[in-house]
Amino acid sequence: MTDTATSAGKIQPRLKQKYKTEIAANLSKDFGFTNVHQVPGLVKIVVNMGMGEAARDGKVIDGAINDLTLITGQKPQVTKARKSIAQFKLREGQPIGAHVTLRGDRMWEFLDRLLSLALPRIRDFRGLSDKQFDGNGNYTFGLTEQSMFHEINQDRIDRVRGMDITVVTTAKNDEEGRALLKQLGFPFRSVEAAS
C-alpha cells in the first residue's frame, strides 16, 4: 500500500485483513507451500440472476437489475440471449438475466456481508453443500430468494428472485479451495448432517 493510501486512512475489509494475517499462513502450513504465490486466494465473485420470465415481460429485468445493484453495490451487466429458441419464445438479443462481477475490496465486503448477515437469515439453513466445487477450486451455490440480504426492503419485493453465486479462487484443486473457503468462514454442511 502506498504512503498516501495509508495517510488517508484507507480501511481494509475485515475478511481481507483476516486472510492476510491468519488464513494465508494457516493454508501455507497445512499444504506445505514454500512460495507465497502458491497459497490459494480469491480472484472474483460473480452474482448471476437468470430471469427466464423476462422473455415474456420486459419489466422483470428492471427489478432484477435494481435488486442486484442494492445487494452488490455495483451496476449489473444485462445478459442477452445468444440465439433464438422458438419453444421458449426467445429471440436473439433479448435480455434474459443480469450478472455482477465483484473484485478487490467490494468482493471482500460482499463476502463478509454474505457470510455474517445473509446466510444466517435463511430459514432452516443447515449449511452449504461442499460437493459443488468444479474441480479447479471454484465454488458455486444458489440462493432461492433475495430477501435474506439486509439491503433489500421486504415490503418492496415485487417477486421472489433467486441467484447463483460463484466464488473463483486461485486454488489448483477442490481440496485447496475447500480449505480456503472453510477458513474464510463458509458454513459447509458436516458429513454426519448430510447423511
Swiss-Prot record:
GO terms for molecular function: rRNA binding; structural constituent of ribosome; tRNA binding. Keywords: Ribonucleoprotein, Ribosomal protein, RNA-binding, rRNA-binding, tRNA-binding. One of its GO terms (cellular component) is ribonucleoprotein complex. GO terms for biological process: translation. Coiled coil: none annotated. InterPro entries: Ribosomal_uL5 (IPR002132), Ribosomal_uL5_bac-type (IPR020930), Ribosomal_uL5_C (IPR031309), Ribosomal_uL5_dom_sf (IPR022803), Ribosomal_uL5_N (IPR031310). Pfam families: Ribosomal_L5, Ribosomal_L5_C. This is one of the proteins that bind and probably mediate the attachment of the 5S RNA into the large ribosomal subunit, where it forms part of the central protuberance. In the 70S ribosome it contacts protein S13 of the 30S subunit (bridge B1b), connecting the 2 subunits; this bridge is implicated in subunit movement. Contacts the P site tRNA; the 5S rRNA and some of its associated proteins might help stabilize positioning of ribosome-bound tRNAs. HAMAP family: Ribosomal_uL5_B. Belongs to the universal ribosomal protein uL5 family. Part of the 50S ribosomal subunit; part of the 5S rRNA/L5/L18/L25 subcomplex. Contacts the 5S rRNA and the P site tRNA. Forms a bridge to the 30S subunit in the 70S ribosome. This is Large ribosomal subunit protein uL5. It comes from Leifsonia xyli subsp. xyli (strain CTCB07). The lineage of its organism: Bacteria, Bacillati, Actinomycetota, Actinomycetes, Micrococcales. The gene is rplE.
